[in-house]
A protein has these predicted regions:
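Nucleic-acid endo/exonuclease domains
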Residues: 1-129
């Protein structure tokens, strides 16, 4: 497995990532404030990784969560997202893409799935924390 070190693209994305943290979508806000902010294993928002900005990132599990809105379903954006996920997975990250509607309509299920992924990736039973 490769080790990733920040590069110049990450530094270029710094201001943009900061801006995205200030202006989250309603679904990102719901996931952050309703679940991830107080999660027993640390998550961060809008993390710069490999020249990209991940919506949410758990370093301990090398887990990236991407919240996909309607614009992610255009052919051009889908191609970009697939390439981006491939690059991140090549670096050893797990990428979980979740649709806005799933967060709106199945919030508990999304949270449960994140719990399962964190436990699988870290080996830590978060139910005991």
């Amino acid at each position: 497995m490769k080790t990733y070190y920040q590069n110049h693209k990450d530094k270029e994305n710094l201001a943009y990532a900061r801006e995205m943290r200030r202006h989250m979508t309603p679904e990102e806000s719901k996931l952050w404030f309703g679940f991830l902010k107080r999660y027993p294993i640390r998550f961060v928002r809008q993390k710069r990784i490999a020249g990209y900005i991940a919506d949410f990132y758990c370093a301990k599990g090398k887990l990236i969560i991407e919240v996909d809105g309607i614009h992610h379903y255009t052919p051009k954006q889908r191609e970009y997202d697939e390439e981006r996920s491939k690059v991140l997975m090549d670096w050893g990250y797990a990428v979980f893409r979740v649709d806005n509607d799933w967060i709106k309509n199945n919030f508990y299920e999304v949270c449960k799935y994140i719990d399962e992924m964190v436990m699988e990736r870290t080996g830590i039973d978060i139910r005991k924390l």
